[in-house]
UniProtKB/Swiss-Prot annotation:
Protein location: Secreted; Target cell membrane
Protein name listed in UniProt: Toxin CSTX-1
Family, as annotated: Belongs to the neurotoxin 19 (CSTX) family. 04 (U1-Lctx) subfamily.
Assembly and interaction partners: Monomer. Interacts with CSTX-13 (AC P83919) (Kd=430 nM), but does not interact with CSTX-9 (AC P58604).
Organism: Cupiennius salei (American wandering spider)
Disulfide bond positions: C49-C64, C56-C73, C63-C91, C75-C89
Coiled-coil zones: none
Lysine amide found at: K121
Keyword terms, alphabetized: Amidation, Calcium channel impairing toxin, Cytolysis, Disulfide bond, Ion channel impairing toxin, Knottin, Membrane, Neurotoxin, Secreted, Signal, Target cell membrane, Target membrane, Toxin, Voltage-gated calcium channel impairing toxin
Comment block on domains: The presence of a 'disulfide through disulfide knot' structurally defines this protein as a knottin.
One annotated GO biological process: killing of cells of another organism
Tissue expression per record: Expressed by the venom gland.
PROSITE patterns, per the entry: SPIDER_CSTX
Amino acid sequence: MKVLIISAVLFITIFSNISAEIEDDFLEDESFEAEDIIPFFENEQARSCIPKHEECTNDKHNCCRKGLFKLKCQCSTFDDESGQPTERCACGRPMGHQAIETGLNIFRGLFKGKKKNKKTKG
């Protein structure tokens, strides 16, 4: 029995030393420095969505979601001070999406009104 306990303790000691060395080697190989992390955060900030009525001229596919649908980048052409046509875009809700959401809100309001009436009757 003593031999079994001594060999178990010896095995655990050797195993813990080996795993500690492997972990140290892994951390040295995969170490992250500030220069490695900064570009990651810059990319994350660039991917944040563009809210409603904000300009999306340079990033037309990155408008936020509002309600049921994602906002669309809607563009218009204007003449600048020099008379050259320039395109300006802003995130907005298309009329079709706006009509659908308004209709659904009215429809939901009808059912909420019926539930309130049932509660007041009983």
